[in-house]
């Protein structure tokens, strides 16, 4: 029996993989800026690019890229809005997507639903709400916290089937499968 030790290292990227990653990063920056809503409640489709990065590059690359994209977005594109908690949230979301999608040729409805549900619950409703309360001091007692979080829960309940549908279609698309075979094989 062969002794195989799984270590957490950054896999080397060839030129095509690196260029694809750069293109996905650029697309992510565009999609993350095309939001609807307020500072407290926003709808964005940046999860699309992060899902692809997680599927193709794995947990370490996707977490690093999520952190880089968050820092670039908060300091260069939208100066003055940086908070390290949101960077941590982006990394946790990337990790969840990677654990669900990386090294899976076909991604089931169940796997996509669990991944999206965990990201929406842990990252969007949980961590991001905590960071916003810390930043804006909006909830000083339980009733004000419930008033603050209720629209966030409703927004994420609405976004859940939308994100699951888009993610499932995207991750199981023939073009994506062909790209995976061509660039990552």
Curated annotation (Swiss-Prot):
Its chief place of residence is membrane
Subunit arrangement?
In E.coli forms a stable energy-coupling factor (ECF) transporter complex probably composed of a membrane-embedded substrate-binding protein (S component), two ATP-binding proteins (A components) and a transmembrane protein (T component).
Supply the gene name.
folT
List the keywords (alphabetical).
Cell membrane, Folate-binding, Membrane, Transmembrane, Transmembrane helix, Transport
- Which segments of the protein form a coiled coil according to its record? none
Q: Kindly list the places in or outside the cell where this protein is found, as annotated in its UniProt entry.
A: Cell membrane
Q: Which GO terms describe its molecular function?
A: folic acid binding; transmembrane transporter activity
The name this protein goes by in its record: Folate transporter FolT
Q: Which InterPro entries does the annotation name? A: ECF_S_folate_fam, ECF_trnsprt_substrate-spec
Q: How does it sit in the membrane?
A: Multi-pass membrane protein
Mitochondrion among keywords:
no
A Pfam family the protein falls into: ECF_trnsprt
GO CC term (a single one): plasma membrane
Q: What does this protein do?
A: Folate-binding protein that interacts with the energy-coupling factor (ECF) ABC-transporter complex. Unlike classic ABC transporters this ECF transporter provides the energy necessary to transport a number of different substrates. The substrates themselves are bound by transmembrane, not extracytoplasmic soluble proteins. Upon coexpression with EcfA1A2T in E.coli allows 5-formyltetrahydrofolate uptake; uptake requires both FolT and EcfA1A2T.
> In which organism is this protein found?
Leuconostoc mesenteroides subsp. mesenteroides (strain ATCC 8293 / DSM 20343 / BCRC 11652 / CCM 1803 / JCM 6124 / NCDO 523 / NBRC 100496 / NCIMB 8023 / NCTC 12954 / NRRL B-1118 / 37Y)
Residues that span the membrane, as ranges:
34-54, 64-84, 114-134, 157-177
**Keyword set includes Transport:** yes
């Amino acid at each position: 029996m062969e002794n195989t030790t799984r270590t957490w290292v950054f896999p080397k990227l060839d030129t095509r993989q690196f260029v694809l990653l750069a293109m996905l990063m650029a697309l992510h920056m565009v999609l993350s800026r095309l939001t609807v809503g307020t500072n407290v409640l926003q709808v964005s489709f940046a999860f699309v690019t992060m899902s692809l990065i997680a599927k193709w590059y794995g947990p370490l690359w996707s977490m690093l890229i999520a952190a880089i994209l968050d820092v670039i977005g908060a300091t260069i594109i939208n100066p003055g809005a940086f908070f390290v908690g949101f960077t941590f949230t982006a990394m946790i979301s990337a990790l969840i997507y990677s654990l669900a999608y990386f090294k899976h040729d076909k991604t089931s409805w169940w796997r996509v639903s669990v991944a999206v549900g965990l990201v929406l619950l842990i990252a969007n409703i949980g961590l991001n709400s905590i960071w916003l309360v810390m930043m804006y001091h909006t909830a000083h007692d339980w009733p004000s916290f419930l008033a603050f979080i209720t629209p966030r829960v409703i927004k994420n309940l609405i976004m859940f089937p939308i994100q699951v549908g888009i993610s499932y279609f995207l991750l199981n698309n023939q073009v994506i499968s062909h790209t995976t075979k061509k660039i990552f094989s």
